[in-house]
Amino acid sequence: IWSHKMRSFLTMLGIIIGIASIIAIVSTIKGTSEQIKEDLIGAGNNTVSVSLNYGDSDYDPEYGMTDGTEPPLLSDQQKEDVMNLDHVENATFFYSRTYTSSVYYENTSFQGGSIYGIDMNYLDTCGYMVRSGRGFIQKDYDEMRKVVLVDSNAADNLFAGKDPVGKTIEIGSEPFTVIGVVEQNDDYQPNIKTIDEYNQYYQMIMGTVMIPNKCWPMAFKFDEPENAVIRADSTDNMSSAGNAAAD
């Protein structure tokens, strides 16, 4: 009887160990898959960035197209087509510069960060919320008001603890009034593997200054190609949505 019970116990133990091993393997695979997704989505809001490349390099608005041709500009119809793509939940189109030496508050130069010319969809698509003051409204665009938003990192770097709202900063020799401070809803935990990813993270921690895209020519004097951020309806559809938008 004891021998029979022992064999039954060992059989059950073997089954339990086998099931536990399968669960562990499935959990490991699932965990690896989730890590890959986490690496892909970055801030966790299912967004994909699409930017203009020239050859093997990103387009640089400081120098333009090296062959002397005009850079391609997005039409309103192209933007609408992107918004209507399958699995695209939202999209935003914006100008971008990482050379911010032309941005000043009094005698403080905004170095190392980014300046964006954004549309009304940008904050929502990229997961920003207004921490103080207000965000952009339609009248800011319609009337081409020289107003600016700063994220919390730019606020710290430019204003050193002062309340930025109501202050005036200079962008490309034009005065812009700070109307709000914004920050992203989710904490971004970077997985830095390349020098480009390090540069992007460095620019992020230095901060971002945002103006209405209608005001971009005031500060930088001419039209430039726009970048896009696409928010997919799920993590699994990010790649297909991003590729469709790029096409």
Residue ranges and their predicted role:
Residues 1-19:
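N-terminal Sec/SRP start-transfer signal
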Residues 13, 95, 171:
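Residues that line or immediately flank small-molecule/substrate-binding pockets and catalytic motifs
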Residues 121-135, 146-246:
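Mid-to-C-terminal secondary-structure elements
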Residues 11, 15, 25-28, 36:
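Juxtamembrane alpha-helical signal-transduction segment immediately C-terminal to a transmembrane helix
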Residues 30-114, 121-124, 139, 157, ...:
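Hydrophobic, regular-secondary-structure patches
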